Amino acid sequence: VRRVLLLLFGVALLVWVGATVVLARRERSGPLHAEFEIAGGVPATLYLPEPAVPGASGLPPPPPRGERPPAVVLAHGFASDHILLSGLARRLAQNGYAVLAIDLRGHGANRNPIPDGRGRPDWLFQDLSAAVEYLRGSPYVDGSRIALIGHSMGAFAALDFATRDSGLDGVVAISGAQTLVGPYRPANVLFLFASADPPGLQERATALAADLAGTDRVEDGKTYGDLAHGTAVRLEEVPGVNHLTIVFSTSTASRVLRWLDAVFRVDRASEAPPDLTDRRLAPFAVAMLGGLVLLAGVGWTCGGLSHGLEERPARGGAAGLLILAAGLLLAMAVLAVGVPAAFLSLEVGDVVVSLFAVAGGLLLCAGSLRARPIPVRELGLALGPGAAGAVGVYFLLTPLGVVGHRTAPTAERLLVAVGAAVLLLPFFLAFEAVLRRGGLVRATVLGVSGRILVVAALVGGVRLGVIPPVVMLMVPTLAVLFLLFEVFASGVYAASRNWLVIAVAESSWLAWLVAILMPLRAG
């Protein structure tokens, strides 16, 4: 069995390395693009409608004034960054548009925290203004022809900005709509929503489209108003996608491109069909498949590095689910009063960490009262292998940094991750203590059941009003990531039964995830 596992992990490693190398090469190829910082400390990537030159650095000389392309600003959603929209940016650049994708304040590599006045609709105005003004002064684009595209929170910001700047040609709002309060009517607006978007979001987009069109209701796929006069409005549903996957959809890119072509009067009748492929997605999928197998391999290796623990009796595992549920329910009562981890200054993230930290503290105290304390000496021995496991998971997920989200934390976020890991450790110690018992299959089933319970608790917290509603949009992604970590946990347990290593690795892993995803708030 050991030889078979080593062979399987070796093949998976070769697949992961090969696919990651191909992914990196394809990231460097495709449309010419460059990363830099614009006014206000806003990180940005500019994509131009010409192929990248291998080995070249920087941008080439700008084109003559009459040959400069129209430009687009891309604004991402909450708990995201510009990398998530890089596929859409590349597809538009491949078809004649210059695209400036930015990290909004508090997100990604943008070190500006989100302000206390984020309840105002214009709280992202400065970042979008910096992007638009950069394009208006850039010698690489036609600064007189600019459109905005936003996803989710970015759609809110794009629509609001368009009511405060009358010099734009169009707006595309993807899975996002809000009340318009600025002095101007946004020009030529396309609303796109996913078939699996929350009903409330779809209703808001439909209502706003109808309001702009001056009618009681709008039909899907019908254009109202006049493009030439800037009054056009269109609403379209993108089938087969959800709030996140809509930005990767070829159908979305096709609809956006058609709208931009109409806004900027681009005639493609004599051209070949638009190239809407993102050649990075295939190697990314292969790398993630190899990484899935390697998660078990990393866990198995970390388990081998740690000292083995005795297999605990199988009985009591099901009762552990009830104990876990009770701890989470009591923690929600605490959150209804205040957020203990607010000092982390992570928007939404401090609430999630607080939920787990309070539940973990309560469960550990209950365990001590029942004469079942955590073995401190064994925990100390588990810190090294657990940290190694967290680092291994981090490296396996590096392909996400190309097509999904920046994975390397900034200095500020690294400090937050350390603090969050300390707060999360009690919960995962308690989680593993009450659930990880019996043989491998039983322990894995209980582990998966516990993770489903945790996701259900997050949903319940939203329903009860103690967790921000935006978490509902993140639940599908969190559920997948939780289940992926169970693959690592099963590898550790198969090698050593050391549930302490699993707890250390998972607290570190979730702390890193929360620290890189959640927006930094002004302290």
Show which residues each predicted segment covers.
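Hydrophobic membrane-insertion alpha-helices, especially the h-region
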Residues: 5-19
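N-terminal membrane topogenic signal
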Residues: 1-8, 319
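Hydrophobic alpha-helical transmembrane segments
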Residues: 224-239, 259-272, 297-300, 361-369, ...
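Hydrophobic alpha-helical transmembrane segments in integral membrane proteins
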Residues: 18-32, 517-523
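Alpha-helical transmembrane segments of integral membrane proteins
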Residues: 322-523
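Cytosolic-side membrane-insertion boundary helix
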Residues: 267-318
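Alpha-helical transmembrane segments of integral membrane proteins, especially early/N-terminal helices
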Residues: 247-254, 315-320, 377-387
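Soluble extramembrane regions of membrane proteins in the secretory/endomembrane system
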Residues: 26-276
